[in-house]
Amino acid sequence: PPTPTVEELQTLLEQVETRRFASSPAVLQVRFTEMRQLQPGFHDAFLDLTLISAQSPVQAKRVEVNRNSFAALLKALYRQLSRQEALAVHDPASPARQLHALLIAPVQEILQEQGIETLLIAADQGLQAVPFAALSDGTDYFGNRYAFALTPSLALTPLAPAESRSQNQLAMGASTFDGLAPLPLVPQELERIESSSAADLYLNQAFTPTVLLERAADQRYSRVHVATHADFRPGGPAESVLHTGTGPMSMAQFADLRRQRRDQPLDLVVLSACRTLLGDADSELGFAGLALQAGARSAIGTLWYVDDVVTSAFFVQFYRLLDQGLSKAQ
């Protein structure tokens, strides 16, 4: 699908706000642009930030960066988060502060002036796996200030407000595997989701590749929740797999849902397996990105390994609030 124009984006943002699907929304595009003339040891790229809101003129900012230094900051922040270390945001040299200075600070004053509260961040390769919520200016975290969602491409994301639809849900997952660590709390997670949101449950042997694809293609369902292991391998979706209760399935199979759900895309696909948001260099958003390629309006994945107990409690609360009218970004 083609990328929407600025005028189309502004019209869509106005519709979203008018129909109260999001509060004061805007699109923030972030991408790298290579410098034509390089100096060894210095900046080798521009970080281009473009802010598009419904009523205001388009705003653009450009920051000089070194790609290797940026990647090192991102890796350091991942390490702190995965080890549950303090982010030390009081220190301007901390990764969370430095990344905020590059990605958010150039447009922060504009966001405040325009009263923006909700952002759709369209992130270029190398930026899709940034944990934006953890970035800080030293006084507060980005995730506390803004409701936001992330997309690898505006062309992949259905932006027009969705019509009211059934909230029928699939809850699928596996707790035991051949050659992989068990996920003992997956049954509890799915059962709690089933009881709180009247989902149809498929666990272990009942969770097969065929069942996943056939049920997800059924337009009676608008949400799919999958709790299992996923493996991202070099070579893209065809080589990467999702582990069902009867064995692995190629992630490339999932992309066919775009064709099958063309008239009524899935509203939400959740993948609460280990690190389902991250892929390889060719597909940073991993299975969550693939869910968007499959035509889902939204997808949720995890940036790092998560505790089963916390995951279960989070998603029960998440679906409860979603059913009460809270937006996914909030």
Give a label for each model feature.
Residues 54-61, 73-76, 114, 122-223, ...:
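Catalytic-core domains of enzymes
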Residues 115-117, 320-330:
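Short, charged, surface-exposed loops that flank catalytic or proteolytic processing sites
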Residues 152-155, 160, 222-317, 322:
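Catalytic cores of nucleophile-dependent amide-cleaving enzymes
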